[in-house]
């Protein structure tokens, strides 16, 4: 179910403050966050945000095509290593 249009998109307050502070200073720093549920808003375009995937922070550069998506969509949490090469040995 999508979020109601009557409500604003969710962005964590601490993340919004950091983005606004960097926009006023016109500096580029990596913003570290654990908030995967935050929505990407137009003021964050051009920033690099390090999103936590459960193990480490992955730096993601925000572009205009990412606006409206959640931060967690760009930091995968699972790492599929592939199926076993030869399954016949384990069946014997």
From Swiss-Prot:
Compartments it resides in: Plastid, Chloroplast
InterPro entries named in the record: Ribosomal_uS19, Ribosomal_uS19_bac-type, Ribosomal_uS19_CS, Ribosomal_uS19_SF
Pfam families: Ribosomal_S19
One MF term in the entry's GO annotations: structural constituent of ribosome
Similarity remark: Belongs to the universal ribosomal protein uS19 family.
NCBIfam families: rpsS_bact
Name by which UniProt lists this protein: Small ribosomal subunit protein uS19c
Taxonomic source organism: Nicotiana bigelovii (Bigelov's tobacco)
């Amino acid at each position: 179910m999508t979020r109601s249009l009557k409500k604003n998109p969710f962005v964590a307050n601490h993340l919004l403050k950091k983005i606004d502070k960097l926009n006023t200073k016109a500096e580029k720093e990596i913003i570290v966050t654990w908030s995967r549920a935050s929505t990407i808003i137009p003021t964050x375009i051009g920033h690099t945000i390090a999103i936590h995937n459960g193990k480490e922070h992955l730096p993601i550069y925000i572009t205009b095509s990412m606006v409206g998506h959640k931060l967690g969509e760009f930091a995968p949490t699972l790492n599929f290593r592939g199926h076993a090469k030869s399954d016949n040995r384990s069946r014997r």
